[in-house]
From Swiss-Prot:
Keywords: Cytoplasm, Methylation, Protein biosynthesis. Methylated by PrmC. Methylation increases the termination efficiency of RF1. Pfam families: PCRF, RF-1. This is Peptide chain release factor 1. Belongs to the prokaryotic/mitochondrial release factor family. SMART domains: PCRF.
């Protein structure tokens, strides 16, 4: 590990010189590339330097204890040695985590698709609750939200809703949300007070660039139709809604919330590219899953990942057996505690697999 860290530090020093070179600065494309590489290496190099400083302090304290006869100095050296030795193991763990292969999608924006599943109107209402939860979470992290497509029920819920969250590290934190979310609560229409169970499915897709997914225009069928509101009521007198079908895979995306046909087509293609990219990722994850059993990070859409129990005010994540009793705050976007726990388990699994 130390040899690898030395190489990374040398690379970091080299990049530090390059980004200050006037000739490199003049070539903005190359300069931006070096700036990103430098920024990516900085956390691990800073942590390595802190680790080296701690090891140096330990060495100095041991030398004092071997050579010094003054009791006061020896006592200070003992205290320093104990303090520094306590830091070694935690620093080594932090360095191991920083050395883990980085998910190339982690810094990307995300497209989130939520669909009401089993449970009719209750499932649609829960899909609306999840949409609000992720919207509030994005606000807490000062990320931007852009609605891409929505099919509402007219009673406060969604059959399905797609939206983009833009912000640094959005995918790194939200990628663990893909799967089936289950809700247990008493519907307002339930006179007998019985608890009903409903589900909604969440898909979190990294936004992709055109260079990452190429779509042959001949593989697309594009239909235009009139936008409609609740119950089929027309909300637009022009054929501005767009349905894009990817013929080879059968993927269908409809968008009608944009102000123009062009905008709806752009949104639909954006979602389609993200879905196709996500399918390719899923195939890769299958290969990885065959090598190691993973609790989190598989992103399997059919996997029941979490239960929201309203009578008990609890949220239980079934992948890591974590239960929190703060349902109201959680649905208001206070979900970092759960996400941090999922990240920790994921990192631990990856370290074990190395």
């Amino acid at each position: 590990m130390l040899k690898k860290l030395e190489v990374l530090e040398d690379t970091y020093k080299d990049l530090s010189e390059k980004i200050g070179d006037p000739d490199v600065i003049n070539d903005q494309k190359v300069w931006q590339k070096y700036i990103k590489e430098h920024a990516d290496l900085e956390p691990i190099v800073m942590k390595y330097r802190e680790y080296k400083s701690v090891l140096d302090s330990i060495k100095e304290s041991k030398e004092i204890l071997q050579e010094e006869s003054d009791e006061e100095l020896r006592e200070l050296a003992k205290m320093e040695l104990a303090e520094m030795e306590e830091k070694v193991a935690p620093l080594e763990e932090e360095i191991k985590i920083l050395l883990l292969p980085k998910d190339p999608n982690d810094d990307k924006n995300v497209i989130v698709e939520i669909r009401g599943g089993a449970g009719g109107d209750e499932a649609a209402l829960f899909a609306g609750d999840l949409f609000r939860m992720y919207s509030r979470y994005a606000e807490r992290r000062r990320w931007k939200i852009e609605l891409l497509s929505a099919s509402d029920t007219g009673v406060g819920g969604y059959k399905e809703v797609s939206f983009m969250i833009k912000g640094k590290g959005a995918y790194s934190r939200l990628k663990y949300e893909s799967g089936v979310h289950r809700v247990q609560r008493i519907p307002s229409t339930e006179s007998g007070g019985r608890i009903h169970t409903s589900t909604s499915t969440v898909a979190v897709l990294p936004e992709v660039e055109d260079v990452e997914v190429e779509i042959n225009p001949n593989d697309l069928r594009i239909d235009v139709f009139r936008s409609s509101g609740n119950g089929g009521q027309s909300v637009n007198t022009t054929d501005s809604a767009v349905r894009v079908t990817h013929i080879p895979t059968g993927e269908v995306v409809s968008c009608q919330d944009g102000k123009s046909q062009l905008k709806n087509k752009e949104q639909a293609l954006k979602i389609l590219k993200a879905r196709l990219y996500d399918k390719a990722l899923a195939e890769q994850h299958k290969d990885i899953a065959a090598e190691r059993k993973s609790q989190v990070g598989t992103g399997d859409r059919s996997e029941r990942i979490r239960t929201y129990n309203f009578p008990q005010g609890r949220i239980s994540d079934h992948r890591i057996n974590l239960t929190l009793y703060k349902l109201d705050a959680f649905l208001d976007g206070d979900i970092d505690e759960m996400i941090d726990a999922l990240i920790t388990v994921d990192q631990t699994e990856k370290m074990t697999a190395i």
